Amino acid sequence: IKCKDGHFAPGSIRPVDWEMQCLFYGIPEWVDDPELRDRLKRQEHISKIWEKISPWYLARGKREIFELALSSPWAGGMVMTPLDALSDEHLEARGYLGEVLTPQGKAVAPVRPFKAPGLPITPQAVSEMGADQLDVTDSPRSLELRSFSDMRLLEMTISWAGPYVGNILAPLGIEVIKIESLSPFDGFRTQRPYDHGMRPGQEHLVEDNRFYEAGGLFNAVNKGKKDCVINIASEEGRNAFLKLVENSDGLVANFSAHVLPQLGLDFETLKQVNPKFVVVRMPAFGVDGPYSDAVGYGSIIEAMGGIAHRQGYEHEEARVSNIYFPDPTAGVHAANAFLAGVYSADQSGSGMEIDLSQHEAMWQHSGEAIVLASTQKRNIGRLGNREPGGTLSTFAATRDNWVAITAPSALTGVIEALIEGSAGKTSEELVSAVKLAGGNAQVCLDPWSAPLKQPLSSLLDVVDHPVTGPMRHVGSPFTLDGKRPVPKAHAPLFDQDTDEVLSRVGHLSVDEIAELRRAGHIGGELPPPASLGFIYD
């Protein structure tokens, strides 16, 4: 939303987000308005809402609005530009940006991927091209690395960013144990795109607790994990969890910065239990700094992380996507952080705490924009559909599909002539013609038809599930030794593995586990979906 000096992204996903906005806007009567408090119904009243709130934003600067968000539970984010990043108090306090020496002079850029002992490495410098070339030897250096199958990760995460860590690591053979509780459990179990509808033919599942097992979003990012339900808020549950820590390699958690310390699970406590333990914490804005207590999720991180400023066409203003790029981005970074931490612990015998800010992880993808801002004192522009450089980049409509096209500038006339007649061609005919002319082209796929097309279909995994049956999921985004890792099992049912994990990993006896379950410290059953407002319509 346009404000006095830029743009602001107001979070509106959670009920508390809407409540705080209404109070700040001075319209508290909207909090309980049945047509507005429901996020899905709210979409039908965009014009009414826009007319009321636009003047409020235009009268205020983005930092002024952000300060309101910082002072409350409201998730909201400034649309930060690269010039904003250079002077941002939070990034400065966390030491994220630093001086980099280049052949063209000094520049400012990100100097580390996350906060951890030994980072950033100094000096930060970019060498002249070819300055560091070495002779290639025929005998590659071998590393003494532990097998993935010998590693175990405890995952205390919710939604997408955190669970994506285990979603990447589990197919490698790493044992990933998802830690849940009755309150809170992973809310992704309840999420459905756009509405609370079910897969066609499975609408009846919302009538009982199979609803929590049928969500495509949850099942997509939790494949191959174990599920262990522990009430860590109780002393007995916490002690049971520490038994798992004793025999695991690490923990990843994507809660707010204060959550683990409040649970008595600060790094020093965990390290006393297991000296080689690696903790990867991935709050929206990191563990410390002025914004560390701020709430953030996909759209907020897109705004604060430089993406919203760059998305769209030249004539447009800032925009966030409907994809939430920061979630999987942070997940990939955190998976790498865990593996780096385990490698370090294996070499040194000492664990470490890694502070991974999702905000900073997103800025990693705009490093050149920060360099440009620091050297030329200007913000990078929007590219729209274009590729960087002097190439032709566009989309063309055909009889059956859209086609993405790129070509060298020298071929502009030839390619544009082909595009002029594209309405009479099929997409495959246009792709062939563009390639024959020396350009490159690809049919634009959609989520419905893409799974049937080669080569994309080879990147999908069909995973059988006891509640939903076979479902297609996007596969691992990489190969190992030429083979793509595949899930070892479906996403776990709630409380599926609690007793087995506590016995095998925590070395608790059958009687100890039974007593913990009887007293409500482990396991349990989620409430009926209807009691939480999930009713299929």
Language-model-detected regions and their locations in the chain:
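A structured beta-alpha segment of the ubiquitous adenosine-cofactor-binding alpha/beta core
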Residues: 154, 203-272
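Active-site loop/turn elements of alpha/beta-hydrolase fold enzymes
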Residues: 181, 232, 284
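Conserved anion/nucleotide-ligand pocket segment
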Residues: 319-372
